[in-house]
């Protein structure tokens, strides 16, 4: 007989019981050390911030940094008292609590002031430097406005404002809103025309009562004597006015009988009688 013997069955590895691993205790030391550093840093920052704020409040309440001197640059149209009142500062104010941007914003509301600079000089001085606008003409745009040398309408006229400036007409508030750049360019051209007239000899700014602008045509002058239209168009003002100056003395006795003078030609002048 065959000798039969039972084979040993292999036990799967996943069924082999292994001795449990020994767990290592968590080392809390480095973790607590790191956390304590973080909390300590945060507490330090908070303490410094709070301390700085308390120091700021303390210094701002003391008399050590109080405003004593307010320096204002010399002005022609706006008084020193008006500047200080508009700035909203006064001696005794805390130097630290004076907000320079706020002071600049307040002063910029005055239309006469073109540029404003405010500086703080510790311990006791505030310096206000401003430049004023200078009117070059009066423009009628539905109401009267002063025009500065940059072609900017900066102030509406009120009772008591001077009117002895060249008068510019032909612009409307609607046109200014719809085409601000185009209107400003035309106003600059009007200023160039005024400068040309100021330098005139026989025919000058004193001979003009009004400078009228038409978007489709250009410029037309109206004479002081008789209100005669002098058509200029656009550009070449110096050459055109020089030609008129050559015959203006002859025309002066006839001004009441003239309908218009047309200079908008390259080589001639048209004088039309009524």
Curated annotation (Swiss-Prot):
GO terms for cellular component: cell division site; plasma membrane. Residues 1-33 are cytoplasmic. Residues 1-24 are annotated as: Disordered. GO terms for biological process: cell septum assembly; FtsZ-dependent cytokinesis. Keywords: Cell cycle, Cell division, Cell inner membrane, Cell membrane, Membrane, Transmembrane, Transmembrane helix. Residues 57-274 are periplasmic. PANTHER family: CELL DIVISION PROTEIN FTSQ (PTHR35851:SF1). This is Cell division protein FtsQ. It comes from Geobacter sp. (strain M21). The lineage of its organism: Bacteria, Pseudomonadati, Thermodesulfobacteriota, Desulfuromonadia, Geobacterales.
């Amino acid at each position: 007989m065959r000798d039969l013997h039972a084979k040993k069955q292999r036990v799967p590895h996943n069924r082999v019981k292994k001795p449990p691993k020994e767990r290592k205790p968590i080392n809390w030391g480095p973790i607590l050390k790191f956390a304590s550093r973080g909390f300590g840093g945060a507490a330090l920052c908070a303490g410094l911030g709070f301390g700085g704020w308390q120091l700021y409040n303390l210094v701002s309440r003391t008399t050590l940094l109080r405003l004593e001197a307010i320096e204002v640059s010399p002005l022609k149209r706006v008084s020193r008292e008006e500047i200080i009142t508009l700035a909203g500062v006064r001696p005794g104010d805390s130097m630290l609590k004076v907000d320079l941007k706020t002071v600049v914003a307040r002063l910029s509301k005055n239309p006469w002031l073109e540029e404003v600079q405010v500086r703080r000089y510790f311990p006791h001085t505030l310096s206000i430097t401003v430049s004023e606008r200078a009117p070059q003409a009066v423009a009628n745009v539905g109401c009267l406005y002063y025009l500065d040398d940059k072609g900017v309408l900066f102030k509406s006229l009120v009772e008591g404002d001077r009117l002895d400036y060249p008068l510019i007409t032909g612009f409307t508030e609607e046109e200014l809103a719809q085409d601000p750049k185009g209107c400003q360019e035309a106003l600059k051209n009007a200023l160039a025309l005024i400068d040309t007239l100021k330098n005139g000899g026989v025919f000058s700014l004193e001979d003009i009562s009004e400078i009228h602008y038409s978007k489709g045509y250009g410029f037309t002058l109206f004479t002081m004597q008789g209100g005669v239209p002098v058509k200029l168009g656009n550009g070449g003002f110096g050459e055109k006015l020089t030609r008129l100056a050559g015959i203006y003395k002859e025309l002066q006795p006839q001004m009441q009988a003239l309908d218009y003078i047309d200079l908008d030609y390259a080589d001639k002048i048209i004088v039309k009688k009524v």
